[in-house]
Amino acid sequence: QVYSRTEASASELASRLGVPFVTSLDEVCTDADIYLVMVKDAVLQELIPDVVKGREEALFVHTAGSMPMDVWQDCACRYGVRYPMQTLSKSREVDFASVSFFVEANGEPELEVLKELAASLSDKVYEATSAQRTYLHMAAVFACNFANHMYALSAHLLEKNGLPFGAMLPLIDETARKVHGLHPRN
């Protein structure tokens, strides 16, 4: 089952997964073993009490890199994090087999479930504490968001001077390929 506040988002994901969807938290089933909560970091904490209510014995998992695992501790008995370190866009397909997943849980049985869940998508599964994940998320912002900002500045500079940004793509691609074999400082 998929829940989203908007029918468009709920129906799109539910259709891809072949499951029903709901747009009210009151309609979310109460007998699932795991609730995977994938929302913007800013709304996670306010949503938690309503998501957990009536489902306290289930395993609750969020996917936020910058939010600690313990956001669940006042409401849920079993909880954790399954963080896919990847930039995600609705308009682009992601090959999850190549994505690194970082997991953390408040108990060993829960951790094993999260490892298995992540391993069903990728063989790049790592344990990381909330503190480690904070630095991981910060490093990801540097590697991805800052790079994208630099691309935007580059595109603006080129377009302003009548040059195509596409001319930069071979350089960008080679730079990205090099980091697979050389340390970034090289």
Task: Walk through the language-model features, giving the residues of each.
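Short, intrinsically disordered, charge-balanced linker/junction segments flanking boundaries
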Residues: 1, 181-186
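Residues at the starts of beta-strands that form the adenosine-phosphate
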Residues: 1, 78, 124
